[in-house]
Every structure is written in C-alpha cells, then in structure tokens.
C-alpha cells in the first residue's frame, strides 16, 4: 500500500491523537499548513485543552527524511511553544530512536507512538505496518552497492566524480549513476561546485546504512573455545590465525572494545574468508550453539575488510563495519554502538580539519 500524501495523512491525524490522548475528537482543533515552506513552519498545529502539538509529516521513515522532519518540527515547536511531533506512515526502530535522541515525539499512521511532554507519556509499539509493500525493494545499501557507501564513509573529507567511484568500487558506471541518483534524491550526498559528490553528513549516511543493514543474513558458524575471558579468547584466536596468514578481522563487541575500550565481552565475532575451524581445533574449538563464545562469519563481500586496522596485535574491522555489526543483538551492543559512532564522528572531524 502506497504511503499517503500529506493532506491525506493529516486527515487521519486528529482521530489518531484523540485515541492516544483519550480525548473526544471534538476536543482537538487542527490548523493545516500543508504547503508550508518556512523554516519554522510545520504541516499542522493541533490544539487540545491542555497542550498544543506542532506536527510535521514525512511520507518515508528513511533516515534522511526523518532527520529533515525532526529539524523542521523542532524549529516549529520552539517558535510556537508546541510539543514537536513527527508523523510517518510507519515507525521503524531507527526513526523512533532518532526522534527520542532529538527530544521529538513521534507517531505513525499504523497506530504506534512515542510522545513525552510535561504531564504526558505515551508509548505504543508493535502494531503492524499498514503500508508494507510486497517484495524487497532495491537498496543503495545492498551488498555490492554498499561498496560505494563504504568508500564515501571511509573518505568523509574528499569529493569524487562518478567515474572515480566506479573505478575504486569495481561497479559499472551505469550502476554508480543509479546509486548516486538515489543518494542525491534522499539528501545523503550533494554535489559541490565542481559537480563532484560529497557527503554533507557522514553520521546521517552511516545511520541510514545501519537502518537497512541485516546482520541476520550473514552465514554464521557458532562454537566454543575454552578461555578465561572474551579478551583472552580474542588474542588466542588472533594469534592462531595470524600464524597461518588467514584473512580475518574481529568485529562486533570485540572490535568495539579494541576501538573504544567500552565494556567487556564474552563472545568474539570474527570475519574469515575461509573457515578457520581446522586452525582453531588445537585451541579446543567445538562447533555448536550451547555455550558458544565464538562466531565465525562469512563475509558477503570482502569489502568488509576495507578500513581494517591492527590494534594490540589483533586485526579488527574499521569503525564503520563495527558499527553495522553491533546489530548482532549481543549484550551491551547498542551502548557500544553509540561509543563507536562517537569515535567515528571524531575521526570525521579530524579528517575535515
């Protein structure tokens, strides 16, 4: 089902808010400004007996669209004194989290919401997406396509022509043209005066990728190696693989610890181009789920190793891949992801001087 226009979406807004606030529909008064273009205008202002809400609608919950909506509705809320709310067809986890971090309320046309204001706390989640389309849409973050995204994130201070990007990524020029067109449309890249591509907000691009990244697609072999700690296990495995010159790199919480020293970990996640199970056998590696503290991941594309670095004698994927793989769902993953993202932000600042 196609996402509705702003006018159609706003026609549903009073009933949705009335239900969330447990008020009769007659208690809500809405002023629409659907065609608003001013920096401090929102699509609608909804007044209740106790509060006012500035509402901005975006027909997509993609990271770039959500970021623009948040910026717009925060300005409107600051000017009017109203509670800022972002309205989308369906709230994904990334959109909800970004709104929470920005102190902007959010709700969707599917019945989910997260709104915090003086004397008000609303949390509704788990309602299905009314606008889910059949099939899997093509994505600029698909396995091969994401090479272009990775290259831009690894070089945040540089500008590239489409020919440059085709050459370094190994993608054909037509594919690169389509990808850059989508990225330009979503506001994730811009063109400079020389018509080269630049990334205005690398953190926004990184979050957009993570939102689409599916850790569950990776082929994973789980097993157990006796070790006194996750750190000790990481060093044991690294030493064994380095001696055999295998291409490998740790990721997930182990990589986050190497990059940021944030939190201990029990389970080591490791990318390897070929199964290292035989090499790890002398360490006591036993394949199986119960008690698994070792996950061996088969990369879908060897570009996962781009940006890899050696820290304390252990080869780790770079900050970008670490941030993506912290979607593994293991303990402290989200907290570690914030630390890794902060470190990447610092690296961007250094690169841009």
Question: What is each stretch, according to the model?
Answer:
Residues 1-33:
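Acidic-basic catalytic patches of nuclease active cores, encompassing PD-(D/E)XK
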Residues 38-78, 84-86, 323:
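Conserved catalytic cores of phosphodiester-cleaving nucleases, focusing on short active-site segments
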Residues 77-103:
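Nucleic-acid nuclease catalytic cores
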Residues 103-115:
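Charged, structured surface patches that assemble and position nucleic-acid processing machinery
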Residues 106, 278-353:
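Hydrophobic alpha-helical interaction segments
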Residues 122-147:
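Short alpha-helical segments that sit at the start of domains
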Residues 148-210:
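Loop-centered beta-sheet repeat module
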Residues 216-301:
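Short gly/ser-rich loop at a beta-strand->alpha-helix junction or flexible surface loop bordering the NTP-binding
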């Amino acid at each position: 089902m196609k996402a509705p226009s702003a006018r159609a979406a706003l026609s549903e807004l009073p009933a949705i808010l009335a239900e969330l606030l447990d008020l009769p529909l007659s208690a809500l008064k809405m002023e629409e400004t659907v065609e608003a273009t001013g920096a401090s205008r929102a699509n609608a202002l909804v007044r209740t007996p106790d509060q006012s809400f500035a509402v901005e609608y975006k027909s997509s919950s993609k990271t770039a669209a959500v970021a623009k909506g948040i910026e717009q509705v925060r300005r409107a809320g600051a000017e009017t004194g109203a509670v800022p709310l972002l309205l989308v067809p369906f709230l994904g986890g990334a959109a909800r989290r970004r709104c929470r971090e920005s102190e902007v309320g959010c709700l969707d046309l599917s019945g989910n919401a997260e709104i915090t204001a003086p004397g008000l706390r609303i949390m509704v989640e788990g309602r299905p997406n009314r606008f889910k389309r059949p099939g899997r849409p093509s994505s600029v973050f698909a396995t091969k396509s994401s090479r272009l995204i990775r290259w831009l994130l690894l070089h945040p201070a540089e500008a590239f022509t489409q020919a440059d990007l085709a050459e370094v990524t190994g993608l054909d020029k037509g594919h690169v043209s389509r990808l850059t067109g989508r990225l330009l449309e979503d506001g994730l890249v811009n063109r400079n005066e020389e018509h080269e591509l630049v990334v205005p907000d690398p953190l926004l691009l990184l979050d957009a990728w993570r939102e689409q990244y599916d850790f569950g697609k990776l082929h994973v072999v789980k097993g157990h190696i006796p070790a006194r700690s996750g750190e000790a296990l990481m060093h044991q495995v690294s030493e064994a693989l380095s001696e055999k010159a295998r291409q490998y790199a740790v990721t997930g919480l182990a990589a986050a610890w190497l990059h940021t020293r944030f939190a201990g970990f029990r389970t080591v996640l490791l990318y390897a181009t070929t199964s290292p199970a035989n090499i790890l056998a002398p360490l006591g590696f036993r394949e199986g789920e119960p008690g698994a503290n070792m996950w061996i991941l088969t990369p879908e594309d060897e570009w996962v190793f781009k940006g890899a670095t050696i820290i304390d004698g252990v080869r780790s994927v770079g900050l970008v891949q670490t941030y993506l793989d912290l979607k593994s769902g293991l303990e402290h993953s989200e907290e570690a992801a914030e630390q890794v993202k902060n470190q990447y932000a610092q690296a961007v600042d250094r690169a841009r001087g």
